[in-house]
Amino acid sequence: MRKDFRQIAWDEPLQEDLRDLLRLAVREDLADAGDCTTLALVPEGARGRQAGVVAGLPAAAMALAQIDPRAHWRPQAEDGQTVGSGQCLARIEGPVHGILAAERLLLNLLGHLSGIATLARQYVEAVTGTKARIFDTRKTLPG
């Protein structure tokens, strides 16, 4: 029996799941005092250190809107795009406290999803020219 695999759709059920996940992440990251470490240690204008495949930009936009609806997200790249070290992925404008409150969550989210996308791209390239194919399957529990 052949199983039909297809690309994950950015549909309403997926967006609702993401909203639930973001609520948990915001509560965990910003429950009491906010992100004092980032405020103290991360320099303004910090950039990524490695090239890779970007993933999670729509999710990051939703995360920012949840933390501070007054902040504006302007993507400078697209999901699936290969980006270079230090390349700008998005520009954010808005109240500084809202942006700083969202910063750690955005970096964690984009770093995690882009890391997965980068590794997946390496696997796809490794099997190019063979009959092998790479598929995403969830082997973890929700939450």
Question: Over which residues does each language-model region extend?
Answer:
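Acidic/glycine-rich phosphate/pyrophosphate-binding loops and surrounding catalytic core
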Residues: 2-143
